[in-house]
Curated annotation (Swiss-Prot):
Residues 261-286, 295-307 have a biased composition (Basic and acidic residues). This is Secretogranin-2. Residues 1-30 form the signal peptide. It comes from Mus musculus (Mouse). GO terms for cellular component: dense core granule; extracellular space; neuronal dense core vesicle. Pfam families: Granin (PF01271). Its main location: secreted.
Amino acid sequence: MAGAKAYRLGAVLLLIHLIFLISGAEAASFQRNQLLQKEPDLRLENVQKFPSPEMIRALEYIEKLRQQAHREESSPDYNPYQGVSVPLQLKENGEESHLAESSRDALSEDEWMRIILEALRQAENEPPSAPKENKPYALNLEKNFPVDTPDDYETQQWPERKLKHMRFPLMYEENSRENPFKRTNEIVEEQYTPQSLATLESVFQELGKLTGPSNQKRERVDEEQKLYTDDEDDVYKTNNIAYEDVVGGEDWSPIEEKIETQTQEEVRDSKENTEKNEQINEEMKRSGQLGLPDEENRRESKDQLSEDASKVITYLRRLVNAVGSGRSQSGPNGDRAARLLQKPLDSQSIYQLIEISRNLQIPPEDLIEMLKAGEKPNGLVEPEQDLELAVDLDDIPEADLDRPDMFQSKMLSKGGYPKAPGRGMVEALPDGLSVEDILNVLGMENVVNQKSPYFPNQYSQDKALMRLPYGPGKSRANQIPKVAWIPDVESRQAPYENLNDQELGEYLARMLVKYPELLNTNQLKRVPSPVSSEDDLQEEEQLEQAIKEHLGPGSSQEMERLAKVSKRIPVGSLKNEDTPNRQYLDEDMLLKVLEYLNQEQAEQGREHLAKRAMENM
């Protein structure tokens, strides 16, 4: 029993002792791991205590060299890395440990011991190191180099990252290079002087002289080649001449090739000419001299032509109006008109007429008829002042050709005055037909000789005369007289009575043509005879109805006034007391009226087309 208890106590004590040992070992390992994590240099020092694979390789290399030295003493082969005594560390720690384990497995313990002993003996046999002044130049000592030596030797600068992990082995001592700073001092002291610069210039000149003959040789070769090609061309030409003599003047190349070459040459020439012309035109445009004289000449010619046309047209129209009016001119105007009638047209005016007809594309006969009829081509406006015939064409004032509102609307009259809506102006009548003839057809010829009770003073009379349009092709004596048909309304209707007289005469002429039943066959050549009152009433009613249709429902005052006019002046009752046996217009006069109305409709159509053309432009 006692032995068993003692055995148990001993086992317990051993267990307790083992537990303490295990806990202490774990604590020590824990502390060591913490220290290694905090201080990695300590880990590197502990790792470097083991023999590195580089050291092993170096020792093996030394041993091989010694063996070769014993074998070949006559021709020793020195290697710059024979004096390596410091191990090279080029890889990381993981690779080092891996290589160490592999080298351990490869070498046995006896080999290890032999290598280590030989290395120790070699270290003991080496002489003591020389002082620092006589120390050989080592590449791994970066402090020995000045900062500018790599630039002086033009060596490759190693990056800082590689220099930290790489160490170069020591070299053998060289007798020629005892002082490592000797060469660098020479380079630093050496500077460029004027003499050195002069020598450099002379060297460059010599180099240029050396390169010169080669260029001359090349030029000579090129010239020889050109001469050779020229000789070949000459031979080819002589062969062609000989062949032409034999064949009969034909070239070697066929006709198709000749044609192709000719066409190609022509195309090239044309392209070159066009390009040259374009360049010249561009240069002229840039300089601002292209086309300016031509355009100015064209504009001047057009302006001169328009001025001449306006002068000739106004001159001839005045001449025709003066001849057709038949009025007696007294004073200087009468003498001038007589001279114009006696004097024929000169060659210059005829030439101008031909030029106008050619530019306007109007036959000369039509142009003369238009001038006689009083029409105005190109919308020329006649002035309102009294006619004064000029002796020469240069005395005629210029026409207003630059008016943009010439074809502004179809309501513009020939005299340049706007037509009121619903009012027709008396325009160019056919030859031999005047307003007086129309009034004679209506039986109102006695109104011409009456005097106007309006216009109390001369100013108002002149003002009213300025408002009246001038009808070309007839004199002012043949125009509609400014008289009052209704004396009891002169105070209210004086401002526009003159226009109403003209409108009424024109409208009655139109109604006469539109309703031919108003004029019986026996009334075309009327003799004063009593007319029944029933016929008068019927004619008055028809005229009133036609006037109402023309004026419309809005103008009641004008309808009342025209009703009074129709009552006061019946169609068949007005007679001329002085000439009771006067004959009136016949069928020819009626045909002239119809021709005038057709002409007016055609002119309205032309104005409408001109307006449409101007709007489209």
